[in-house]
A protein has these predicted regions:
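Domain-level recognition of nuclease-like catalytic cores that cleave nucleotide substrates
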Residues: 109, 117-154
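A structural signal for isolated positions on well-ordered beta-strands in alpha/beta enzyme cores
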Residues: 84, 115-117
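N-terminal capping/linker segments that flank leucine-rich repeat
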Residues: 35-45, 137-138, 151-154
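Arginine/glycine-rich "motif VI" loop of SF2 helicases in the C-terminal RecA-like domain
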Residues: 105-113
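Active-site metal-binding core of divalent-cation-utilizing nuclease and nuclease-like domains
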Residues: 36-79
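Amphipathic, low-proline, heptad-repeat alpha-helices and/or compositionally biased low-complexity charged/polar-rich
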Residues: 1-31
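Conserved catalytic cores of phosphodiester-cleaving nucleases, focusing on short active-site segments
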Residues: 24, 65-73, 77-96, 100-105
Length: 154
C-alpha cells in the first residue's frame, strides 16, 4: 500500500508530465520548429510499421510506447525532421537518462532521427553527468541545457 507521500509524489509526476504534454510547443520550441507532441495513435502508427517489417520486436515497441512523450518537429539549424524522446520526472535521475537514451535509439530504428531528452524540476548531479556523457538534452523548469553545457558554474 502506498504512503501518502508516495501518492502525492506520483500525482506531482503525472501533473508535470501532463504540463509538458499540453505545453509541448512552448517547452520544446527552443530545440525544434513546428513542434507537435505525438498522440498515442500517431506513435503506434510510426512504431507498428517497424514492427511489421521486423525492425523492432514486440518488447522493443513496448519500450518506445512507455516513453513519457515523443515530440516531432524540425531541427532549428537546418530544418531537418527530428523526434525527441522525452522522459519526465520531478527529480531526474540516472535511470531517466538511461531510459531516454534507450528509447531514442529504438525509435531511430523506425527510420527517423531521434534525440533523448529528460525534463523535470531538478536533475541530480549524477544524472547531469550521465546526460553529458550520453548526449542527452535537459529541460529543467523550462530551461534548456545542451548535452555539452557546463553546468558546474553557478
Amino acid at each position: 500500500m502506498q504512503t501518502l507521500a508516495e501518492r502525492v509524489g506520483s500525482l506531482h509526476g503525472e501533473s508535470l508530465e501532463q504540463r509538458y504534454r499540453t505545453r509541448g510547443p512552448a517547452y520544446f520550441s527552443r530545440l525544434l520548429r513546428g513542434t507537435h507532441v505525438l498522440s498515442s495513435d500517431e506513435l503506434v502508427r510510426l512504431v507498428e510499421r517497424a514492427e511489421e517489417q521486423g525492425t523492432l520486436s514486440d518488447a522493443e515497441a513496448q519500450e518506445i510506447y512507455d516513453a513519457d512523450l515523443v515530440v516531432r518537429g524540425r531541427r532549428r539549424p537546418d530544418g531537418a525532421p527530428l523526434y525527441l524522446v522525452v522522459e519526465v520526472s520531478v527529480g531526474v535521475g540516472t535511470h531517466d537518462v538511461e531510459r531516454a537514451v534507450r528509447r531514442a535509439v529504438l525509435l531511430t530504428r523506425t527510420g527517423v532521427t531521434a534525440l533523448p531528452v529528460v525534463a523535470g524540476n531538478w536533475v541530480t548531479p549524477e544524472a547531469t553527468e550521465a546526460a553529458r556523457a550520453y548526449q542527452v538534452w535537459q529541460l529543467t523548469d523550462g530551461r534548456v541545457i545542451a548535452p555539452s553545457a557546463d553546468t558546474s558554474q553557478g
